[in-house]
UniProtKB/Swiss-Prot annotation:
Compartments, record wording: Cytoplasm
Full protein name: Exodeoxyribonuclease 7 large subunit
Species whose genome carries this gene: Streptomyces coelicolor (strain ATCC BAA-471 / A3(2) / M145)
GO biological process, any: DNA catabolic process
Subunit annotation: Heterooligomer composed of large and small subunits.
Enzyme Commission designation: 3.1.11.6
The encoding gene: xseA
Entry's family note: Belongs to the XseA family.
Amino acid sequence: MAANSTPEGPLPVGEVSRLIGGWIDRLGAVWVEGQITQLSRRPGAGVVFLTLRDPSYDISVSVTCYRQVFDAVADVVGEGARVVVHAKPEWYAPRGQLSLRAAEIKPVGVGELLARLEQLKKALAREGLFAAERKQPLPFLPQLIGLVCGRASAAERDVLENARHRWPAVRFEVRNVPVQGVHAVPQVVQAVKELDARDDVDVIVVARGGGSVEDLLPFSDEQLVRAVAACRTPVVSAIGHEPDSPLLDLVADLRASTPTDAAKKVVPDVGEEYERVRLLRDRARRCVAAFVDREERGLAHALARPSIQDPHRMIEERAEQVTALLDRGRRSLRHHLDRADSELTHTHARVVALSPAATLKRGYAVLQRADGHAVRDPGEVEPGETLRARVSEGDFSVRVDA
């Protein structure tokens, strides 16, 4: 329950420390898992001092135990080992310091570690951190490569030498960090984040030259896995441990079997690229030559056509054809005109011969009554009626006598 206090009636530091100690005492003994980061065994001392650290959250707590408790596991436990401790929390009031008094220490075996890693792997996989669609492609020719590795390590040498042998102009930004032990995870995470924050870094390589399962535990740490998953820069894992791949291999954008393999996958080989360029150049030359040859043959075929070799000949042939057609047209037109003229003359003669004027010229006359009606029958006129007689050269009046 909360202690009663007010601004006017605050609790003294000693009282607060005593209350905290009381709450901690009521907690009782607990099982705690962590990694031993410091170990102090003074000769002749009956107490062993340890520092137990949670690598995922970088939180540590002091642990004390009797020598006989530690001696029971001294052969298999040392700095960097993961252990499970059965301990009672203690509060040292004068310093306001929390510690654990261990009554039993158990090392975490490889089998148990692998089982826990498998559980973590499944949990992270359910979150989609290992999904293929999250993988980023590596740049074809990175200008600056970030390298996270141990100082003066074989992994660093393998990556640098092989990459520069393949592409001498490549540059590196190297971050030397512990790659095993209690300080590995926070420093590797920090190095990855620093390189990822730089705009000029094209790809990040995390390299280590293999090791035991325990040595490679930092590269399966959840904190590191999530840091790599959050990177905007492509990350290559080159831990070099085939049988049991750390979780970093699964979350990285590309897994390399060794640091040397990482160098080969990150940068192209200058000799291979020169050869590829040569082959492409030869192929382009052959394609251009074939194209030019094909076009030359087509041009030669076109030039061989009569219309190209002697263009005037075709025009002259057409001109002769036009002249012949004109002559034929004139002859045909003249023939049609002559025949039409003959027919017209013949028709005109017939018309003239059959016309009333020709009949009158032969001595005939046309009698017309006063209303202009031609007389065809004697019964149409009456005695004494005046008629108009029309002859070839004119007309005159006549009177009907009887």
